[in-house]
Amino acid sequence: MEALQNMVFALCEAAGTSGAESPAAAAAAGFLESAAQVEIDPMGNVVGRLGKIGAPNRILLNAHLDQISMMVTEIDADGFLRIAPCGGIDRRVLPGSPVTVLGRERLTGIVCGAVYGADKLPPLEEMAVDLGMTKEQAELLVSPGDRVVYSGRPQRLLGSRVTSPSLDDRAGCAAVIRAAQLLAGEDLSWEVIVLLSSREETGGPGAGTAAYVLDPAQAICVDVSFAVQPGLQKGKYASLGGGPMVGIAPALSSGMRADLTRIAKQEGIPYQLEVMGGSTGTDTDHICIARGGVACAMLSLPQRNMHTPAEIVDLQDLEWTARLMAAYVRGLV
């Protein structure tokens, strides 16, 4: 579990916002290259090949690289950085929060904004990042388009739980890489393609274009989903440490789901179900419609505090997810 934690922490500490994933891609490629032939495609996706490379049947193991962030839109006359969302930022946690501006160098700032009272939040366009600089000083280090991310470092909690910004979806990337490591060197019937995709938080073009080029027959997509916490009741949401959430949705293959749950029972891997009546809101929605269609399954990692600076996952869920994917791939003929 220590090696898995080290990988998760290293991935979370690498910047990788939508459309600017290069540092995170380099970190992920470094962990993957011992198990697969790795390249980074024109969209910034990390692609790793293993198993029976060149086989007519290919399975994609997917998670997304990018983290939610904000983008500098202008530097106002008083030196404040005006910002816009780059993905689904949770503005409830922003006022008074420290953030990191990825300018010509990494800068620490504080989000400030209009004060409406405890029962109302200012819209994001009324918030700004305070660097403690004048306009002239800020312009030497920051430009419109620079990204702003939550400050914070990964930390171990009790047991096998960890907290960090960007666990959505670096935790999923770690689970997919771990699955590749488990499969490395094995005599497999299918080609296995790891796809750590770009720009999921801003529409999913990374996964969509890669799935078209790679042309898999099947795909297993790993992302995070909501875990039980105050305000989210048991039964509708998953439990941390309860195993991966196997997805049920119109876009997903019922046959693959049945095989995954059967294999989980055989392997003694706990799992939970996640029922979605419409789209999944993940890269699965883009992969499943590539070319003539791709049979897709979805495994979600239970997570608390999604899209905040203190997301929480259980490393045991990541390990079980990796082992379930590896067992599924071994069974393909």
Regions found by a protein language model. Name each.
Residues M1-V333:
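N-terminal hydrophobic/helix-forming segments and targeting peptides
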